[in-house]
Amino acid sequence: MSQLETRTEPMVVNFGPHHPSMHGVLRLVVTLDGEDVVDCEPVIGYLHRGMEKIAENRTSVMFVPYVSRMDYAAGMFYEAIVVNAPERLANISVPKRASYIRVLMLELNRIANHLLWLGPFLADVGAQTPFFYIFREREMIYDLWEAATGQRLINNNYFRIGGVACDLPWGWLEKCQDFCDWFGPKIDEYEKLITNNPIFRRRIEGLGAIGRDEAINWSLSGPMLRASGVPWDLRKVDHYECYDDFDWDVAWEKEGDCYARYRVRIEEMRQSLKILRQACDMIPGGPTENLEAQRMAEGKTSPFMGFDYQYVAKKVAPTFKIPNGELYTRLESGKGEIGVFLQGNNDVTPWRFKIRAADLNNLQILPHILKGAKVADIMAILGSIDVIMGSVDR
């Protein structure tokens, strides 16, 4: 008697763009053969707002409030990159104290970014409790941001060409140290709950594995790259701001799967705490902004006693011109390498302003690592990438 063969027709299923596990308005057109993923096509662009064209029609300081809407989970990374580009092109130095303040804000953003990744990722794989814990810690970071910038999450508008908008208020550094002392044991609490949990490990170990060469060839960055055995961190490589003043290590793993990406982000939060503690202890005195970018006159060539040269605006001067030239500048955000290609033509607005989003590049590998996976694993693999669609679509 011949054995009966069961044949299934491929089925096309749409995930998103309104499903909560999509982490924004992302749509996945998935082709299934039973429970197995045969193909996946990400459909992006639902949150496109023309950020690059807006930048090309705004002065450098006018564009800063826009950028935190791109990565609305940790917007100060984009604030930093859009002021770093004109600073380097115009050769404007940043005072040491301002650089330390920037590092404090960026590392708080990194922790907040990883926390907001951790909660939904664990909820996607079935662990609901930590989702509520992460907002307890983020609330303390919100309080620190509110005290320093006036805003709690987005539109902090704190970074300026040549420094920051204002100095830290009295007692802020002590509050930041209190947060570091309080948050360290909370990371241990997460690890006790999650890291060696046998159910969690069986659920995600081996899922979405990416080899070292694959990660490099797909231009991955951030935790996606470091979890695949490449200890590449722009804070160490490019030596920007004052990261060389601190003692910290690059977090990386070799396995390249969802579990390795989780371990990298947990360790990155520990390293961010180390940097925060050192920055609070070592921060120097001095100014928090370079006034040269705020003078109405064009640089040091104008008469020193002239009215325009002596007048210093509260913000970057509206006559600040981006010099002729072009450059690409980058930094390490919580999701990976974000960068700006800036082309100036001696005008107050840039000729070209190209934004490189880390999560857009990281998302491109999703169809490759989903093929052969089970339909139930789609959310776990997508969640491990950490995408924010405001940044992907721009």
Curated annotation (Swiss-Prot):
Q: Could you tell me the keywords of this UniProt record?
A: Membrane, NAD, NADP, Plastoquinone, Quinone, Thylakoid, Translocase, Transport
The UniProt entry's GO biological process terms, in alphabetical order, are: photosynthesis, light reaction
Per UniProt, subcellular location reads as:
Cellular thylakoid membrane
Give the EC number.
Answer: 7.1.1.-
Q: Tell me the GO molecular function terms.
A: NAD binding; oxidoreductase activity, acting on NAD(P)H, quinone or similar compound as acceptor; quinone binding
Cross-referenced HAMAP family, in alphabetical order?
Answer: NDH1_NuoD
**Protein name (Swiss-Prot/TrEMBL):** NAD(P)H-quinone oxidoreductase subunit H
Q: Which organism does this record belong to?
A: Prochlorococcus marinus (strain MIT 9313)
